[in-house]
Amino acid sequence: MISPYYQEENITIYNGDCLEVMKELPDKSIDLVLTDPPYGVDLKYSDYVDTESNWFDLFESIIPEFKRIADVSILPSCQIKRLEYIYKTFPPDWLICWYKGSAGTSGFLGFNDWEPLLVYGKKKIYMHDYLAINNNEKMGSYGHPCPKPIGWAKWFISRVTNEGDTILDPFLGSGTTARACKDLGRKCIGIEISQKYCDIAVKRLGQEVFNFAEVNQ
């Protein structure tokens, strides 16, 4: 396996191709894959061509690996129109509706206010099939064109895993999943092809989090 780009207690970040790194991970060594792959809608990335055709190739490559290495995998389907294709190729075990509220991007009849999330794995987990968390991270937050809110990551991590479990984010981006794992006492393996975003993720990990609960005790 390639050497880690960054490592601290419970957090390891690799700068490289996620498919190459995941091939080195043992079967069922990950408790949860929580990630947000490229959307295939021509977003501007410096290290990846975000075309729709590349999205199909990527999806068909990553899902078998997720199912091999992880107990549970959760990821956005990105485009509602792709659900028919997804159910024909790699049908999920569960589908969750993420309602973004007024922060969702406006679209035809407001359909972009919600996004389907794919769940692979049959581990017994306690979640509803409906998630309401505002997408309050602005486009360009932390230098990334499409960040997920940290509350989104923490919601899944806290419900699907226990303290000390290992979470994998093979499209780490600006490091939201890694930061959430650090806050919640989980181990995290992050993979990111862009060195720029690896550096941003490392910087986020070094930020102190103000604990209001401790102050109010």
Describe the function of each predicted region.
Residues 1-8, 202-215:
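Short, conserved SAM-binding/catalytic segment
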